[in-house]
């Protein structure tokens, strides 16, 4: 019975690994080969079934022959996937328990007086509990170990703000950024830099995606090659790159790289030196502006660096505005003293000189 239970457990574990095998995860390949060899061994012990054992060895050989096919280092942790695998494995364990009881009962009715190996329903229940404990434990261990491995080995997790800002400063001395580049200094993103193609992107992981803010910065003549390189880098760890807010002039590069598009909105830029409110269109705006100025409100732009007193005032305003909510970050920015001190600050003060 030990070999029978072990064979069942190994089969369920291989079923669990099927998703990771399909995803070409390197660790799944190693475990699968080990489980197949053990399965072949216990199949022989269970009933000296040479045909089944040979078939498992053939499958093992195919795995070994396709070793290079499994190239991914890791996969993103997902509670949904973990729970789904636990439910699927439990379904098969319950199916084993009830079908085993039914088969034994039918066999006993046909062959009265024959002693059965599992003579009572409790034997199947006890076996199911044991198998559940082992298989579910394996699922939890498998996912948590991968999560721990990711924390230790994902290359971007070791990046510090100083490292990111130095890399960004260096590339911006040669190439211009875009309207979103300054948000990288908010410190809530990681970067990927290609020294070969002289390009850089800022991104943040979310579920199985690496969300990239804007277009790559640097030598845009190498953009297509860089997009391919970054996709291969993300794919190595089981992620998919997603680009947020890209420039229209680069759409052909993204299209040729196989990306699909989803329009969320449009962006408008205004040349301030040519901007005027003298028209019927801005009548309501002028009225509001004049009323605020009459009430003592004043708009001004302060050059950096800013005093600690000013920073503390705007931090108070920021906290009052947020309330119990959290900072959005990413493309919307967040309150960060170092980030604020990197650029001019636009403020509105009331008649008492307080920032509102």
Q: What would you call each of these model-derived segments?
A:
Residues 1-158:
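Topology signature of small-to-medium multi-pass alpha-helical membrane proteins
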Residues 3-7, 41, 149, 153-215, ...:
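A conserved beta-strand-loop-helix scaffold within acyl/acetyltransferase catalytic domains
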Residues 74-79, 282-289:
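Short intrinsically disordered coil segments
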Residues 229-233, 253, 291:
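Alpha-helical scaffold elements within enzyme catalytic domains, especially in hydrolases
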Residues 266-267:
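A glycine-rich helix N-cap at a beta->alpha junction
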């Amino acid at each position: 019975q030990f070999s029978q239970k072990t064979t069942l457990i190994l089969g369920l574990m291989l079923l669990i690994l099927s998703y990771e095998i399909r995803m070409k995860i390197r660790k799944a390949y190693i475990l699968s080969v080990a489980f197949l060899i053990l399965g072949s061994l216990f199949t022989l012990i269970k009933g000296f079934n040479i045909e089944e054992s040979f078939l498992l060895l053939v499958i093992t050989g195919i795995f070994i022959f396709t070793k290079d096919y499994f190239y991914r280092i890791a996969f993103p942790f997902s509670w949904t996937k973990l729970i789904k695998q636990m439910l699927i494995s439990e379904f098969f364990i319950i199916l084993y328990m009830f079908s085993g009881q039914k088969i034994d009962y039918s066999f006993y009715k046909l062959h009265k007086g024959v002693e059965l190996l599992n003579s009572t329903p409790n034997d199947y229940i006890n076996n199911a509990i044991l198998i559940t404990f082992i298989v579910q434990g394996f699922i939890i261990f498998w996912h948590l170990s991968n999560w721990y491995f990711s924390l230790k080995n994902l290359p971007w997790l070791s990046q510090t703000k100083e490292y990111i800002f130095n890399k960004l400063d260096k590339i911006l001395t040669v190439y211009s950024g875009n309207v979103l580049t300054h948000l990288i200094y908010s410190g809530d993103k990681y970067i990927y830099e290609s020294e070969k193609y002289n390009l850089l992107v800022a991104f943040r992981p979310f579920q199985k995606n690496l969300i990239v803010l804007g277009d790559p910065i640097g030598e845009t003549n190498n953009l297509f090659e860089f997009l391919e390189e970054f996709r291969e880098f993300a794919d190595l760890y089981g992620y998919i790159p997603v680009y947020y807010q890209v420039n229209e002039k680069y759409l052909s590069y993204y299209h040729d790289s196989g990306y699909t598009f989803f329009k969320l909105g449009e962006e408008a830029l205004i040349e301030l030196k040519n901007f005027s409110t003298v028209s019927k269109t801005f009548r309501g705006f002028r009225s509001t502006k004049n009323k605020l100025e009459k009430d003592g409100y004043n708009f001004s732009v302060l050059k950096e660096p800013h005093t600690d007193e000013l920073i503390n005032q705007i931090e108070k305003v920021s906290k009052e505005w947020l309330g119990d909510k959290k900072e959005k970050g990413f493309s919307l920015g967040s309150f960060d003293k170092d980030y604020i001190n990197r650029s001019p600050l636009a403020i509105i003060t009331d008649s008492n000189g307080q920032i509102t």
